[in-house]
Amino acid sequence: MAQNPFKALNINIDKIESALTQNGVTNYSSNVKNERETHISGTYKGIDFLIKLMPSGGNTTIGRASGQNNTYFDEIALIIKENCLYSDTKNFEYTIPKFSDDDRANLFEFLSEEGITITEDNNNDPNCKHQYIMTTSNGDRVRAKIYKRGSIQFQGKYLQIASLINDFMCSILNMKEIVEQKNKEFNVDIKKETIESELHSKLPKSIDKIHEDIKKQLSCSLIMKKIDVEMEDYSTYCFSALRAIEGFIYQILNDVCNPSSSKNLGEYFTENKPKYIIREIHQETINGEIAEVLCECYTYWHENRHGLFHMKPGIADTKTINKLESIAIIDTVCQLIDGGVARLKL
C-alpha cells in the first residue's frame, strides 16, 4: 500500500488560509472540532470541500472527510504541503545544569495553569530519571528529560511551550545565569553588562522605580533581541517583555488597591473600543492619571499578548510575527513603562 504523502507533515497551520486563498479557494473557513481534529472548508474550482487536519506529536496529517466531495482533495492538500511547511529553523534546545524537584514542581504547575498538558513518557535513557512530553491542543510539543545528575533538558520547537519555559526560567535564574545560558544555547557572546547598560538607556526615568522581576523580564527580551537566528515565529523574543508590562500593571494596582492573588487583570478592565477602561466597580479607587496609564498599558498588553501565544482552541487563532515586529513590541513596552512611571511620579 502506498504511503500517504500527507501524513505527519510539519505544517505551520497559520499559513494555510493565505496559501489556499492565493491559489483559488474562496469562502475559506476553519473550525476546531477538538484537540485532535480541525476542519477547513471552502470552495475550489466551483466545488465545496471539507478536509481534516489532525495534529499529533507536533506534526499534522491532512485527511479526507467522509461524506464530503473529495474531487480536489489531492490538489488542495498539495497546496498546503508545498506552501505551509515549517522551514529548517532554530529548534528549542535548553539545558539547566541544576534543577531541583521543587523547581520541576513549580515549572509543571506554571505550565499546567497556562493550559499545557504534561505526561510522563517511557524512559529508555539509562542516564535519565524521568522523561516528560509537554503538548498543546494546537500540536506544539516539547520533550523534557530530567537526568540523574540533576540537570534538565528541553527539546522542541521555538513556539508556545518554549516561550513559557523561557518565561519561567527568567523568574528563577539570576541575570548572570540567564546570559550564560543564552550564550551557550545560541553560541553567542552577550555580556551581562551590555544588557544592563541597554536596560538603563531604555528606562532612564523608571530603572530605580520598577520591581526587580520586571527588570529581569525586560532584560530577557533584550537578550533575545541581540540573537540573530532564523525562527518561524519571533514571538518568543517579546514574550518576556509582555510579561514585564503585565507585571508593571500589577505593580501600579498594588499601590492603589492591593489586588488579591486570585484576581486576574481582566477583572479591572472592560472593553470600550478602541481601548480598555477601568470597570465601573473600581473607578472610585482607580481614576485620574493612574487609570489613564493603566488603561494604556493594559490595552497594549491585551492586543499583543492575546494575539501571540495566549491559549486559544487552535493554532489558527494565534499570530506569527517577524523579528522587526517583535523588536517593536519590546521597544514600545519599555516606552510605556518608562513613560508611565514619569507621569505617575512613582
Swiss-Prot record:
Q: Which residues form a coiled coil?
A: none
Q: What InterPro entries does the database record attribute to this sequence? A: RnlA/LsoA-toxin_DBD, RnlA_toxin_N, RnlA_toxin_NRD
Q: Which Pfam families match?
A: RnlA-toxin_DBD, RnlA_toxin, RnlA_toxin_N
**What are the UniProt keywords, alphabetically?**
Endonuclease, Hydrolase, Nuclease, Plasmid, Toxin-antitoxin system
Q: Which GO terms describe its molecular function?
A: RNA endonuclease activity
Q: List, alphabetically, the Gene3D superfamilies matched.
A: 6.10.250.2650
Q: What class of enzyme is it?
A: hydrolase
Listed EC numbers: 3.1.-.-
Keyword Glycosyltransferase listed: no
Domain of life the protein comes from: Bacteria
Q: How does it assemble?
A: Can form a complex with cognate antitoxin LsoB and with enterobacteria phage T4 antitoxin Dmd.
> What remark does the entry add?
This plasmid is only found in Sakai-derived strains of E.coli O157.
Q: What is the annotated role of this protein in its UniProt record?
A: Toxic component of a type II toxin-antitoxin (TA) system. A stable (half-life over 20 minutes) endoribonuclease that degrades mRNA. Degradation may be translation-stimulated. Overexpression in the absence of cognate antitoxin LsoB causes retarded growth and mRNA degradation, this effect is mitigated upon coexpression with antitoxin LsoB or enterobacteria phage T4 Dmd. Degrades late enterobacteria phage T4 mRNAs, protecting the host against T4 reproduction.
Q: What is this protein called?
A: mRNA endoribonuclease LsoA
Q: What is the lineage of its organism?
A: Bacteria, Pseudomonadati, Pseudomonadota, Gammaproteobacteria, Enterobacterales
